């Protein structure tokens, strides 16, 4: 498992529209570089580029933490029994607060106004873009892995390094989203903190905790390929990785659609999934699609607008 805080962050440009659903991933549903999106606030699906969806303005921006925020995050980190895991998670806090510490030290130094202004611009770039760049570093490692998965090839999982890259990637894809932020926001916590300030760091902490647990299970886990043998396409959404056992469960069977005719389940459940390749029909595809829809925050995506429109009319409660 890698702590992506070691990766350099290019600061030549500021990315305003920051994606919590990977654009490269969504391209599998595109035709002529566009896919269909059904938003909760729009009655009709619309055809658009992946760059225009699954994103919010400065979604990953780091802010200066208050004493209460730090106390809350340290309490969260302290739950881990592993000293190494606590160290990794402390690294996320340190990385997120690095620019504010630099700014504090600069305030006590006599610097020419024009140089101070340039330094301030650089620090603001770091605060606004470092989070997305860290996620981008994880995704970069996953590009060849995703390509293999879409070929129904999981041989990479037998190699420790690429197995851990996959686990790290899917853990971050699970926790990095607006939906997971909103779920955590709804949970009451006795420690006073501002979720707007803590969440961009919490997402890394939760993902690191999950990845550590999954790495520990090693070869007990398998990648199950679900082949869509029906005319009903797999969809995806703005929460593209879901836990089939429930969002509030500690145990996870992670479902991840890869394209309209292929999805995977990452599981340790040999009894429920005895085969690594399973052909499924329309009813099962509908069930998985409804789960993606039910866990979506505000958007679902696919290559069939009529199907998305019909699906979005259903209640989000479990129908299967």
Report the location of each language-model feature.
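Alpha-helical structural context detector biased toward long hydrophobic helices
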Residues: 2-17, 21-320
């Amino acid at each position: 498992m890698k702590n992506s805080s070691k990766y350099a962050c290019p600061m030549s440009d500021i990315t305003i529209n920051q994606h919590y659903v990977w654009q490269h991933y969504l391209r599998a549903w595109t035709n002529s570089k566009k896919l269909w999106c059904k938003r909760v606030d729009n009655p009709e699906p619309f055809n658009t580029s992946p760059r225009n969806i699954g994103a919010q303005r400065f979604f990953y921006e780091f802010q200066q933490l208050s004493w209460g925020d730090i106390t809350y995050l340290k309490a969260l980190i302290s739950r881990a029994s592993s000293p190494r895991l606590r160290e990794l998670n402390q690294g996320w806090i340190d990385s997120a607060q690095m620019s504010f510490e630099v700014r504090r030290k600069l305030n006590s130094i006599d610097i020419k106004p024009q140089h101070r202004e340039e330094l301030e611009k650089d620090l603001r770039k770091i605060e606004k873009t470092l989070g997305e760049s860290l996620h981008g570093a994880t995704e970069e490692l996953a590009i060849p892995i995703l390509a293999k998965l879409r070929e129904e090839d999981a041989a990479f999982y037998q190699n420790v390094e690429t197995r851990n890259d996959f686990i790290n990637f899917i853990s971050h894809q699970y926790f990095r989203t607006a939906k997971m932020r909103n779920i955590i926001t709804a949970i009451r916590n006795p420690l006073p903190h501002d979720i707007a300030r803590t969440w961009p760091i919490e997402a890394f902490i939760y993902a690191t905790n999950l990845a550590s647990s999954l790495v520990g299970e090693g070869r007990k886990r398998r990648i199950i390929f679900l082949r869509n043998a029906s005319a009903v396409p797999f969809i995806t959404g703005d929460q593209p990785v879901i836990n089939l056992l429930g969002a509030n469960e500690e145990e996870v069977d992670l479902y991840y659609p890869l394209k309209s005719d292929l999805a995977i389940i990452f599981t340790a459940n040999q009894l429920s999934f005895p085969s690594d390749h399973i052909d499924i029909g329309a009813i099962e595809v509908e069930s998985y699609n409804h789960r993606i829809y039910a866990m979506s925050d505000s958007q679902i995506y696919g290559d069939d607008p009529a199907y998305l429109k019909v699906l979005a009319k259903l209640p989000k409660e479990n129908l299967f």
